[in-house]
């Protein structure tokens, strides 16, 4: 199987880059810069990512870059540098990189001045092309042995270089983001130059992952952390397919679930997937420990610690349980700044109970079969495992549940209020046939009370916020429905108007409804 090694220097786009390569049916894997070269030299190509590092302000060229380029000198194995990756390549080949010179952020136009294999059948000399830039440092002069393929129109700075003989290419822009329209084709050209075979599929992932699970678990037992969401459902189905009755599924009712969620979980696992599940009601424990807590990070940590503690109690009732299965996926890892590629390079945005919220004293070894998959890849995997579309198309639900949708202090009364409002909103979205065309929708309860008038009487109740977004993979998101056609927009506006009326008339304690139009970035999809 062909394989591409991505050296992650901390770019927030690194996981998206890996995903885009997989879209081309070529397996990609991410490594930290401190990886031993012997572990990765068997790949078909190397990509050096972008990141927050600065060549002029660094302690020199990382050892892994020396190793890769010395290997390239002997073998001509293809190397692609993106943003910081271009800058570190250029510096290696005796070019100057300068800080705070010719900064570019956002959409940029390139002047293509020379043909190259990397742009074949995409652009040619004399063309102009749109790309997405995000850099403060710039390559000042042409690296030794390279030719410039493109300059930026904005400031005539070097935007793309190539050494055709050694098959080394550099791009100051980001081909992996959707805002670079021809980016996927540029990546495809690079992989063609590398001779990569399009032999990675979700089906092959299932087979490989089953073997990996069997090897990791042996004859031990696994306790599974089920949530009823897409991720844990697919993870459980894959793990059960691999080890059968060695998997013991437990669903904890933490009192912070969607309306009627326990019954839906029973229907899903016991009736549809035929996987035995033990349901444990610990809602009082969670709500008691969250009393008076308002900080979102503390909420997540408390939920994570309580979650593991209860699982340890359940595991102690069984003999031979050494592993905990979780439905952790890539965006969880990215935003937590933990595990693998992002551990030492990226900024923590927020912890996830599946990742950053786990206690250091946790007694289990983790089984995370979906850890390197994006949400849409998880859904493809689920279809291949025979899981129904209705289950797979459920909107994402955060591990800490409604705790991160109740801003401020959590009470049982607020939970019931939010459950009712959210159920009304989601059912109306389904009524208007919009559920399957959006990525995620939910209600947030604010710690703000507002004055209203109902039945000629003054009211003083909570405000809530409706949210709906579209996304490819959870890494970025656009507010719904502004990215949709006009008919869908009007349908959604009618939907939220009806939702507002229904929530205010049906849910005691809420007297005002607002709508959140913020994209990700700058916001995250969830409020906390």
Curated annotation (Swiss-Prot):
Residue intervals of the GMPS ATP-PPase domain: 200-394
Pathway: Purine metabolism; GMP biosynthesis; GMP from XMP (L-Gln route): step 1/1
Active site per the UniProt annotation: 83 (nucleophile), 174, 176
Residue pairs linked by disulfide bridges in the UniProt entry: none
Sections of the chain in a coiled coil: none
E.C. code: 6.3.5.2
Function statement: Catalyzes the synthesis of GMP from XMP.
Protein name: GMP synthase [glutamine-hydrolyzing]
């Amino acid at each position: 199987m062909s394989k591409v090694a991505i050296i992650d220097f901390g770019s927030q786009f690194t996981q998206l880059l890996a995903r885009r390569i997989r879209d081309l049916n070529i397996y990609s894997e991410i490594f930290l810069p401190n990886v031993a070269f012997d572990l990765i030299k068997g790949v078909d190509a190397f990509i050096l990512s972008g990141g927050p590092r600065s060549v002029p302000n660094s302690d020199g060229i990382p050892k892994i870059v020396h190793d890769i380029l010395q290997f390239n000198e002997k073998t001509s194995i293809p190397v692609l540098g993106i943003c910081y990756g271009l800058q570190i390549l250029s510096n290696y080949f005796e070019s100057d990189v300068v800080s705070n010179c010719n900064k570019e952020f956002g959409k940029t136009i390139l002047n293509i001045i020379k043909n190259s294999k990397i742009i074949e059948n995409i652009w040619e000399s004399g063309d102009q092309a749109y790309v997405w830039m995000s850099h403060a440092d710039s390559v000042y002069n042409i690296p030794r042995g390279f030719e410039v393929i493109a300059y930026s129109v904005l400031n005539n700075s070097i935007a793309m270089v190539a050494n055709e003989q050694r098959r080394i290419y550099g791009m100051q822009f980001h081909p992996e983001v959707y805002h670079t329209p021809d980016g996927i084709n540029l990546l495809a050209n690079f992989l063609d130059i590398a001779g990569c075979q399009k032999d990675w599929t979700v089906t092959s992932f299932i087979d490989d992952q089953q073997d990996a699970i069997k090897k990791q678990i042996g004859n031990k037992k696994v306790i599974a952390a089920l949530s009823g969401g897409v991720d844990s459902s697919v993870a459980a189905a894959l793990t059960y397919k691999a080890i059968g009755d060695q998997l013991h599924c437990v669903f904890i009712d933490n009192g912070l679930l969607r309306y009627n969620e326990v019954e839906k979980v029973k229907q899903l696992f016991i009736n549809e997937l035929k996987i035995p599940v033990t349901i444990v009601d610990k809602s009082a424990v969670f709500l008691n420990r969250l009393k008076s807590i308002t900080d979102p990070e503390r909420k997540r940590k408390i939920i994570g610690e309580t979650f593991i503690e209860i699982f340890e109690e359940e595991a102690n009732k069984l003999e031979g349980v050494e592993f905990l299965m979780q439905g952790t996926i890539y965006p969880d890892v990215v935003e937590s700044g933990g595990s693998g590629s992002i551990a030492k390079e990226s900024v923590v945005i927020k912890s996830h109970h599946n990742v950053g919220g786990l206690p250091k004293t946790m007694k289990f070894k983790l089984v995370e079969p979906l850890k390197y998959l994006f949400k849409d890849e998880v859904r493809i995997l689920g279809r291949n495992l025979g899981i129904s579309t209705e289950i797979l198309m459920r909107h994402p639900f955060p591990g800490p549940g409604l705790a991160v949708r109740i801003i401020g202090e959590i009470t049982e009364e607020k939970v019931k209020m939010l459950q009712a409002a959210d159920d009304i909103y989601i059912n109306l979205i389904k009524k208007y046939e919009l559920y399957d065309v959006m990525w995620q929708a939910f209600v947030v309860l604010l710690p703000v009370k507002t004055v209203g008038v109902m039945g000629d009487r003054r009211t003083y109740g909570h405000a809530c916020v409706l949210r709906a977004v579209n996304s490819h993979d959870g890494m970025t998101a656009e507010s719904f429905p502004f990215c949709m056609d006009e008919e869908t927009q009007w349908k959604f506006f009618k939907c939220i108007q009806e939702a507002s009326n229904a929530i205010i008339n049906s849910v005691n304690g809420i007297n005002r409804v607002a709508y959140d139009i913020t994209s990700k970035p700058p916001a995250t999809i969830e409020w906390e």
